[in-house]
Swiss-Prot record:
Residues holding GTP: 39-46, 61-63, 91-95
UniProt source species: Mus musculus
Transmembrane region(s): none
Reactions it catalyzes: GTP + H2O = GDP + phosphate + H(+)
Pfam families membership: GBP, GBP_C
Coiled-coil ranges per UniProt: 375-411, 477-582
Domain (GB1/RHD3-type G): residue spans on this chain: 29-271
Keyword Plastid: no
Molecular function terms, GO-annotated: GTP binding; GTPase activity
Predominant cellular place of this UniProt entry's protein: cytoplasm
Upper lineage: Eukaryota, Metazoa, Chordata, Craniata, Vertebrata
Gene Ontology terms: biological process: activation of innate immune response; adhesion of symbiont to host; cellular response to interferon-beta; cellular response to lipopolysaccharide; cellular response to tumor necrosis factor; cellular response to type II interferon; cytolysis in another organism; defense response to bacterium
GTPase domain (Globular): annotated segments: 1-304
Protein name: Guanylate-binding protein 3
Tissue/organ expression: Brain, lung, heart, spleen, kidney, liver and intestine.
Amino acid sequence: MEAPICLVENWKNQLTVNLEAIRILEQIAQPLVVVAIVGLYRTGKSYLMNRLAGRNHGFSLGSTVQSETKGIWMWCVPHPTKPTHTLVLLDTEGLGDVEKGDPKNDSWIFALAVLLSSTFVYNSMSTINQQALEQLHFVTELTQLIRAKSSPREDKVKDSSEFVGFFPDFIWAVRDFALELKLNGRPITEDEYLENALKLIQGDNLKVQQSNMTRECIRYFFPVRKCFVFDRPTSDKRLLLQIENVPENQLERNFQVESEKFCSYIFTNGKTKTLRGGVIVTGNRLGTLVQTYVNAINSGTVPCLENAVTTLAQRENSIAVQKAADHYSEQMAQRMRLPTDTLQELLTVHAACEKEAIAVFMEHSFKDDEQEFQKKLVVTIEERKEEFIRQNEAASIRHCQAELERLSESLRKSISCGAFSVPGGHSLYLEARKKIELGYQQVLRKGVKAKEVLKSFLQSQAIMEDSILQSDKALTDGERAIAAERTKKEVAEKELELLRQRQKEQEQVMEAQERSFRENIAKLQEKMESEKEMLLREQEKMLEHKLKVQEELLIEGFREKSDMLKNEISHLREEMERTRRKPSLFGQILDTIGNAFIMILPGAGKLFGVGLKFLGSLSS
């Protein structure tokens, strides 16, 4: 993108998603690092974001007391250090703009920035003091503006206890900072400055409680915190009015150094935007999230992460089924030369392509808890396999009929000119027909319908052969009877040979179905184990953070608040234990994937038994 575009418009107190911005996001298949900046209006947020983009111009700065940015603006740029990622910068409307009609929109802008970003930058002026913390009261409203789960928890634990599992990293950017970084006479880092400012203070009055609430929320919701303090870019007020046009060498050296540190930190440490369960957010996924959240706000409900992920999963999993099925069809078409000599040749290619297709689906799908979409894939691939089998059979029939047409041309001419209407004509006819059969045997790649087409050809000749046999004056009645019996025997042998081929092909189809069933179950088991490990890692991180906060509160002298976390920590430990001991879901898998096979595949009762045996071997 050459310039930013409005992502969420804020017009007359109504939030609207800009569909042009969504179309841009839909073109980005890479994972995203999403950096959002929030803060009071006219505090230099846009200028800082332009520096992240490596440009002087981009997000509009303005030079008056009026807020320039309205809604949320987006700028997608190549990530400077991660070529496989796209950096998405979100510049938000300034908080506290006196020209706004409804201050509630400030809260929604703040909440959207938290929900959409992987790194959340709060921008303020001068120092982190009581006033700065009061201005950040929006963080205390997040419990009313965001929900993690779609329904209340049965264990009565607050929904906000889940926030730590999906909230972004938090950066506090302090602009025009003129103080010395010292505490009790010793130098401290910016991070230590922030953590000291976030320590709770003793006191029971309302003002202290409110500022402590802000401190608690920041510490509790945002496990990863960082602070940067910036000098004023220039002491020349005239240059400040047109700061975007000021060359780098005219900026204060300290500002340059701190800006470089800030950008370098985000480029190096800014994490990929992910959802619960390790779902990586790409451009099109971010677009879906934006629309889902804004629709929820406009409908009067609270944006819910679980609902958003479910909406996203429905859309993405449908696409994953299509992508996997298309991969199957494309690879089958590329690797097969019709007609194949045998059905097994086709089924071998099918097995390889199906395995790849399942892998494609697993890679692009998530939260398919009931295996609804994997079941659709099973059905779709089976339908497409059957279509390839039909195409293969049709190609074999066309090829064989064409070859028999060519080989039997002389026979037809001989019949037309009466060459077999002579004594000994039946013997001559049999020789001519045998020559056709021998020539047919030499034809390459006749395909799976070779015997069937030959049988049809011979059947079409039966009346003519009998006519020639009956009119052959060189034969006695006994010899005619023997010849007729021999012909019947040959027909029966060919019928038996064809039946054996069909039985063999049916066995091959059953083997292919069993292999397909095993492949689906194995891949699903692998994915479920991976998701279980991911969930445990997330829970372990949450537990580690809650224990850290609990210990800090105890050290700071807030035992009551520390004790209040015990219930959450206890419930989280119970959840982790349930996750570890989660019973096998193979029965559920069999109900879904197995039923898909039972509905669409011949001989599925046998296959179902194979599935039970296979699942037993996996779960033992």
